[in-house]
Amino acid sequence: MTITKIHARSVYDSRGNPTVEVDIVTETGLHRAIVPSGASTGSHEACELRDGDKSKWGGKGVTKAVANVNDTIAPALIKEKLDVKDQSAVDAFLNKLDGTTNKTNLGANAILGVSMAIAKAAAAEKGVPLYAHISDLAGTKKPYVLPVPFQNVLNGGSHAGGRLAFQEFMIVPCEAPTFSEAMRQGAEVYQKLKALAKKTYGQSAGNVGDEGGVAPDIQTAEEALDLITKAIEEAGYTGKIKIAMDVASSEFYKADEKKYDLDFKNPDSDKSKWLTYEQLAEMYKSLAEKYPIVSIEDPFAEDDWEAWSYFFKTYDGQIVGDDLTVTNPEFIKKAIELKSCNALLLKVNQIGTITEAIQAAKDAFGAGWGVMVSHRSGETEDVTIADIVVGLRSGQIKTGAPARSERLAKLNQILRIEEELGDNAVYAGNNFRTAVNL
């Protein structure tokens, strides 16, 4: 079915920054996608094109990316008369039109908006939900797998004030029997945590960060983990709800000294207290012995490959590469060869097309890795990643706390998918790392 119209516009994300929205019109109607954007970004990500004009939106405008869709991509793609159901042909055409390896020319935000909208148009033409179309594109088997929601309930690092260096602490309801039950458990723990934070740290500690988590004035990881453990206990889920961390350690890595500064938000940080990667690895291991931690993301800096391989040999939990791999086939291949981690954080906007995102997941699955589909800190009401996580059978999604509509939009979409699929879907539960094989 041919495309009759492609139109992009600038809209706003959850942080009030401009982002790209793309409409594609075919005989089945209008198909719309909005692109997200990240706060702590890996240096090897596909290029998110921003205007750079400091007098407007602080330089974060996307009028160039929007113009690239309207003036360059739209006429070329319509003229090409490609079938919207042939996602790989469309994405290959977009990449060829851009002509660079990391989408610098047109912008990954321009290309991805089109790629996502194309997938929605194709699903409509086939008369199937988007997750079913993604499943066809990826060639995944049935039954469908509903993911474990990794809920970011407490923020530190560059997402929050306070001295806490680690960026995200997540609750993981992997013992729940169903996705909807996992959501209930997560929401109940979140409410307890919020009340506890206010009681312990004062009223303002209940305020939420970019991803819906609370950000009390916490100094150490232990303090954060104790608070979460207490909330889990008060909600009655001790032993049933696990914990995951996204350390985002590239943010506090001192490359010249090859050390990690856990007091990086303090300009007068004491250099003698900076840690080597071996010391940091020991810290993770002792935390994992004390608390029910099942997954650690970005435990080391994106260029500290030696540290990753060292940790991999000694830790048997899930080690997720995000800044390390940036959803990029070359870095994923390198991480597989060097045995750096055992799971991929899949952010569609890091690679810039649906086809390449699916391929990245397949590469990871092929190495026996887990795949966690992820939102970005600057999100929108677009729910494409909810359909992607179900279509890929990846079994784990990270899309914030059960708070803020742009986070809940994805989780609510998975609730609808769960209802629609009924017995044709299983909840990943404790098998979240190997869900693709269920």
Curated annotation (Swiss-Prot):
GO MF term list: magnesium ion binding; phosphopyruvate hydratase activity
Catalytic reaction(s) noted: (2R)-2-phosphoglycerate = phosphoenolpyruvate + H2O
Keywords: Allergen, Cytoplasm, Glycolysis, Lyase, Magnesium, Metal-binding
Pathway stated in the Swiss-Prot or TrEMBL entry: Carbohydrate degradation; glycolysis; pyruvate from D-glyceraldehyde 3-phosphate: step 4/5
Entry-linked SUPFAM superfamilies: Enolase C-terminal domain-like, Enolase N-terminal domain-like
Residues reported in the UniProt entry to bind substrate: H159, E168, E297, D322, S374, H375, R376, S377, K398
Catalytic site: E211 (proton donor), K347 (proton acceptor)
Gene3D superfamilies: Enolase-like C-terminal domain, Enolase-like, N-terminal domain
Cystine connections: none
EC number: 4.2.1.11
Recorded family membership: Belongs to the enolase family.
Assembly behavior: Homodimer.
Protein name per UniProt: Enolase
Organism listed in the record: Alternaria alternata (Alternaria rot fungus)
